[in-house]
Curated annotation (Swiss-Prot):
GO biological process annotation, one example: isopentenyl diphosphate biosynthetic process, methylerythritol 4-phosphate pathway
Spans through the membrane: none
InterPro entries registered for this protein in UniProt: GHMP_kinase_C_dom (IPR013750), GHMP_kinase_C_sf (IPR036554), GHMP_kinase_N_dom (IPR006204), IspE (IPR004424), Ribosomal_Su5_D2-typ_SF (IPR020568), Ribsml_uS5_D2-typ_fold_subgr (IPR014721)
Protein family membership: Belongs to the GHMP kinase family. IspE subfamily.
Alphabetical UniProt keywords: ATP-binding, Isoprene biosynthesis, Kinase, Nucleotide-binding, Transferase
Species of the source: Shewanella sp. (strain MR-7)
Metabolic or biological pathway: Isoprenoid biosynthesis; isopentenyl diphosphate biosynthesis via DXP pathway; isopentenyl diphosphate from 1-deoxy-D-xylulose 5-phosphate: step 3/6
Name of the protein described by the UniProt record: 4-diphosphocytidyl-2-C-methyl-D-erythritol kinase
Function comment: Catalyzes the phosphorylation of the position 2 hydroxy group of 4-diphosphocytidyl-2C-methyl-D-erythritol.
Listed EC numbers: 2.7.1.148
NCBIfam families associated with the record: ispE (TIGR00154)
Active site: K14, D140
Residues involved in ATP binding: P98, M99, G100, G101, G102, L103, G104, G105, G106, S107, S108
Lineage: Bacteria, Pseudomonadati, Pseudomonadota, Gammaproteobacteria, Alteromonadales
Amino acid sequence: MSNEISRNWPAPAKLNLFLHINGRRADGYHELQTLFQFIDCCDLLDFRVTQTPELILHSDMSAVVADSDNLILRAAKSLQQATGYPGGAEIWLEKRLPMGGGLGGGSSDAATTLVALNQLWNTQLSNDELATIGLKLGADIPVFIRGFAAFAEGVGERLQAVTPTEFWYLVIAPDAHVSTAAVFQDPLLPRNTPKLGIDTLMSQPWANDCQDLVVSKYPQVAKALGWLLEYAPSRMTGTGACVFGEFSSQQQALAALAKLPSDMQGFVAKGMNISPLIVRLNHP
């Protein structure tokens, strides 16, 4: 078996272009309607297939994340268990995305692990089968596995391909950690946005139902969003803390980035309706 390292598997960030909360289910999960689009800012993963079943992760993050809690290792283990694959893998993570900012980095890392190892191990699961494994690990993982911009419903598992405009975005990552669980448990979170058809949702102004609550509790998010709104239509992604503004050109986005206050961190990225992971899979 080859010891060659398969390099530069991208795990792209996502933006929620809108996020509506339609209700709360008996099991505590929330019914959502949201629009996912990828951006060209990615974590990068390398893989080496091994004959022994051990799974080893190298990362500057791994020292603070228990193996049992790390989505990358859980994803690899889940694929082993689902397929009976007898070997293992050595995995290297280059973390480029902000942690816990609503960009989906952890879910994307897990999805890339499933997609890459399915190919490298030649386990030949379909995307549907990989998405089923991924959904057990996190609600956002299937959209990264399928690799197309999508309108999502339910808890995020029902996906319909869409083609929103591929804007240039200025993404700001405030110095704040927003707990997704705390946001969804907060009694002040709106939970009664009417469910609408996709055509209606795509044609009306977009909003994030979590935004007002998070802005009210996190001054750093409020400050970043307030600054960004001076330059472009802007809102929060996921439950935050990251916010993004839409620009029609890279030049406009970079011009705004150049004016970013010194106490804020941001980057410019391109919207992508086809994930860089799918591009990598089809053009190794």
